[in-house]
Amino acid sequence: MVIDIVTNQFSNLQNIKIFTWKANFESIRINLQHMHLYHYEHIHLFTSSQSYMYHPNARFSYSPFCCFTDTLAYLRCEPYRGYRKCIYRKVKMPNLILRNPLVRYDVSPARYPTIGIRS
């Protein structure tokens, strides 16, 4: 699954909450078009399913989550109030090749917007 955020409504926010259902954590990607990752201190990932696992071969249990031009942000997952708290770290890497069709979500501006993934 690919989440394609095509607006820049989050450019001045510090947090984005993303709620997922029936989604494999390792398959989730976010394509942050028209955004600057340095504006984000952290991103929270909440899931109603505990079926996902850390990537077995990833050091420090990083999983690819965000992609922006030549910057790839990795998320570190750790227990957090019954969920997983994911904090991204920016590293310079080539663009991810997104093999799955993009799913677009136009999110209305809000202080802490939520993105619901239904499938």
From Swiss-Prot:
Gene Ontology CC annotations of this record: mitochondrion; nucleus
Keyword Mitochondrion among record annotations: yes
UniProt entry keywords in alphabetical sequence: Mitochondrion, Nucleus
Compartment(s): Mitochondrion; Nucleus
Name recorded for this polypeptide: Uncharacterized protein C83.19c
